[in-house]
Amino acid sequence: MTVEYLTEQHKKGRQLIFDLDDTIYVETQFLFKVYKEIAQTAINVNPNLIYNFLKKTFIDDGRKDLFNKLKSSFPSESFSLDKSLSIMRNYKCDHCIETLPWFRKLLSNMSSEFVIKIITNGTPQQQYNKIKSIKLSWPEELIEVVYASSYAAKPKVLSFYQLKGVEKFISPIYVGDSLTDEQFCKKLNIEFYDIKKIL
């Protein structure tokens, strides 16, 4: 399956719906900018040490307890979990993050009326800020985002039914990258397109 497949299916009247993180863009592009901001709050330690710690810990262990690990690894700093989370949830840049090449290619195949439909998990404010930070190069009124966590996070299906005109959808395709996305599609009985196949 390729971008051409998605283009062809859309021409047949099927709706394309997308996950956000690591589907449309690489999430670490955003996260590492946030980590740099958090590192800049350091007073007693070189911010580059903090930044490199956050990056390495995320790559090695994921995001679980990341800021608690930061606090315990740099006891001379007065890192506040609340302050770090606040930076995390409120950071945005002005269209500073590129979409993945496959997504740009897909959009170049679409008509000017194509609506980018996104269903994304995560803290709604942070996901909103990510959308604002991504260079989608598409009219804002043609971007529809459902913040699943405002209803029930994927793989629960409630978020799907928040899309405009969902009752008229014909055999939609959900484009994602994770087991959660795949389970979401199974519960909805819709096609899951694993983007990792073309990345």
Model-derived segments and spans:
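A metal-dependent, Asp-based hydrolase signature
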Residues: T41-N44, K55-Y91
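Short, acidic loop-to-helix structural element flanking the phosphoryl-transfer center
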Residues: N90-I118
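Acidic, divalent-metal-coordinating active-site segment for phosphoryl/phosphodiester hydrolysis
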Residues: D177-Y193
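Active-site neighborhood of HAD-like aspartate-dependent phosphohydrolases
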Residues: M1-Y51
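Substrate-recognition "cap/lid" segment bordering the active-site pocket of phosphatases
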Residues: T123-I173, L179-Q183
